Amino acid sequence: MIELFGIKNCNTVKKTLDWLVLNNIDINFIDVKKDLTSEHLNQWFQNLPSDLNPLMFVNQRGITWRNLADSNKQLINSTKGIIELILQKPSVMKRPVLVNNKKVVLLGYDEEKYQKEFA
C-alpha cells in the first residue's frame, strides 16, 4: 500500500488524494504535522531515487520558508539540518511525499509521473 505524507488542507495533497482515489490506488494518509518522525526522514534520505535529493524536500517558495529566520534557513546546508528543519516546521516540506515499501517514489504532484508509476 502506498503511504501519502502530507497535510490534509494542502491543495496539492487534496489534488493528489483525488487522483489516487479516482484511479483506485489504495493509500494510507500520514499527517506530517502529527505523525512524521526523524526515522521516516532518515529512511527516505538514505534510499532516495537518483532524481531526488534531500534539499528537494524543502519548499523554498512557500510562505513557511519565507517567514523563517535566517538561522533556520541555514539548516538546509546539511541533510541533518534539513531533517531538523522539517521536524520543527513540517509545513516547509514539499508535499505530497508518496512512499512505497519505505522508499520515496514520488515528491509533489505530477500527474504524468503518477500515471507512469501506477499504470
Placement of each model-derived feature along the sequence:
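Unusually extended, aromatic-enriched hydrophobic runs near protein termini
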Residues: 8-16, 54, 114-119
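Local sequence-structure signature of Cys/Sec-based thiol-disulfide redox active-site neighborhoods
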Residues: 1-23, 27-30
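Thiol/selenol-based redox catalytic cores and closely related redox-interacting motifs
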Residues: 34-117
